[in-house]
Amino acid sequence: MTNEAVKQSARRRLACALGTVAMAGTLALAQPNWGTGLGRTVSRDPAPGQGSRDPSPDIKSLHVQGNVWMLVGAASNAVLQVGNDGVLVVDTMTDGLADKMIAEIRKIAGDKPIRYIVNTHVHADHTGGNEKVAAAGQSIIAGNFAGQVGQEAASFASVIAHENVLNRMSAPTGKEASRPLKAWPTDTFFTEDKDLYFNGEGIQLIHIPAAHTDGDVMVYFRKSDVIAAGDLFITTLFPPVDMAAGGNYKGVLTALNRIIDITIPRDKQEGGTYVVPGHGRLTDEADVVDYRDMATVIRDRFQDAIKRGQTLEQVKAAKLVRDYEGRYGANSGPWTTDQFVEAVYRSLTAAAPSSTATTPPKAPAPTQGRGGRK
């Protein structure tokens, strides 16, 4: 066995061990409180590990490759990019783990400032530490942006997210905001992607609409060749779909295929582009392909049942996912098999959104009259 093969094998053993820590924490979190006004599906917590009860206070770290590190906590995974420019953090776990997360960042990065935080979506197990982690950082202020406003802005890391994350955090409908003001994103975008250049490499923030939620972003570190997938991809359970937050199973499949489009495997389909899931162990393209294939087979089975007119109860009784339950199913906890089956069925039977708001009305068809068209 070559030295490189030994390194690959050791990396996979460590990644699997870290994944076991993450999965143990995930299954211990059953009914977190997401606050008010988030709907039935969210109140049952579809995304694994959400909430403030952290059964294990430890955070483990793993150097993935290049500038990128993976942090594994009981609630979720986070990602660091560390270099001469400072630190970029992808997701901040929970408020209860924020102090330990900051301490782990200091172990890895020393006194390098936390410059950016990227939220992959709105859920509290990925954004709960925003306020504390941002306060431990420092923004890059350029030009003539000075005075009190500039000084105050510079004393926090910039929090980047899709605008739908801010919309849901700030409760624009007039209801009480679900998060403190200082936890909200400070830099949002509404386009398909956003680009950064930090620590000597290009970073792509890729938005996948209507997938796990309506504000999902995957982060691709181009030089390091690592993707932080958030909850668009997990290894512990069936794909979580928060329909109350704009999610849809069809979008999850789109996200998985997009990840596969980006990843390039190394020798024997191992290594190459690494993918850090929102929950679970470190993975590569082959792992995502396996997960995508499972999700696609399930979609096809449900579509066939729906075409034959089966109701949700009939689909549940048919147990169309039973051959995958041993690996991804759960009878209790944050995301059960029944919740998954219901989300897939409702996603595939939901009416297509009206296009009248974005598509101009068609011009009336020309009529034939004397002398030609008029």
Which role fits each region the language model picked out?
Residues 4-18:
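Bacterial N-terminal signal peptides that target proteins for export
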